[in-house]
Amino acid sequence: MEKMCSEFRPDGKRPQPVIGHVLVEALPYIRQFEGKTFVIKYGGAAMKDEVLKNIFAENVTLLRKVGIKVVIVHGGGDAITKTSDKMGLETTFVHGKRVTDLETINVVQMTLAGKVNQDIVQLINEDGGNAVGVSGLDADMIRAVPAANAETLGLVGQVAEINTRYIDLLTDAGLIPVIAPIGYDMESNVYNINADDAAAAIAVALKAEKLIYISDVEGVRVGDRILKTICKADAAEFIERGVITGGMIPKVVSAYQTLDGGVGKVHLIDGQITHALLLEVFTNEGVGTQFVVETEKEILS
């Protein structure tokens, strides 16, 4: 017999029903979120590891294909530091924030709005996601003012205003805006803006259904367990009792400021978990912590 063009299933292997269960579990979420806006802050290891970068692009593309409007705001601090080093520029941080002079802001623009942004766009487009790379300077998207400690940090800004019409124009056209967090003021001074802060401001301005932070943190930890859901009252109590400490405090405070601004839910997930984005959005258990204003009970996973 000539070589067969048919193909057998592997001996002893039967289709795994768990895959079907996962797909069915996702269906009500797909219906619920169709036409809604998700703002995703993309950072951490998920931006550095090649496998995780491709998985993120696939996940984002799938969200868009099922009718969710996706807006991405990305970081890129490591890339900025590497470029600065190559150019012989000194990198200085004060309380974890980059001191940004005129030379450094040029590096920020070149790196964030250049290679970092375009690499993300390319990966998403290779999966058919129709991404477009922009910065806060495009179409007057992000108006900024100097940060409170600008005398020390230099050209580090905070968001004053978001041009939602431009973002809506892109998402309504089926595109995925990938935004470099740079803004400028009325005197055309350009500012480096913290990506977390920019994502939160954009989510509030768009009245997004979700703001999702992708980082290297599993979620909000209480003892040796991760909170699946945390409500505002419990968060305040955990901070007061010293259960939530350190760098998690500003994350929690920012999350509830965002919810107070009209965003539906805020999520904190670990981008090192394979398909963390889809698991958080489309499964009952999720993988990280979701912040809500009120919940019937505290759920620990």
Swiss-Prot record:
The keyword Cell cycle does not apply. Its EC number is 2.7.2.8. Its main location: cytoplasm. Disulfide bonds: none annotated. This is Acetylglutamate kinase. Catalyzes the ATP-dependent phosphorylation of N-acetyl-L-glutamate. The gene is argB. Substrate binds at G76, G77, R98, N192. One of its GO terms (biological process) is L-arginine biosynthetic process. Keywords: Amino-acid biosynthesis, Arginine biosynthesis, ATP-binding, Cytoplasm, Kinase, Nucleotide-binding, Transferase. Belongs to the acetylglutamate kinase family. ArgB subfamily. It is found in: Cytoplasm. The record marks K41, K251 as: Transition state stabilizer. It catalyses: N-acetyl-L-glutamate + ATP = N-acetyl-L-glutamyl 5-phosphate + ADP. Pathway: Amino-acid biosynthesis; L-arginine biosynthesis; N(2)-acetyl-L-ornithine from L-glutamate: step 2/4.
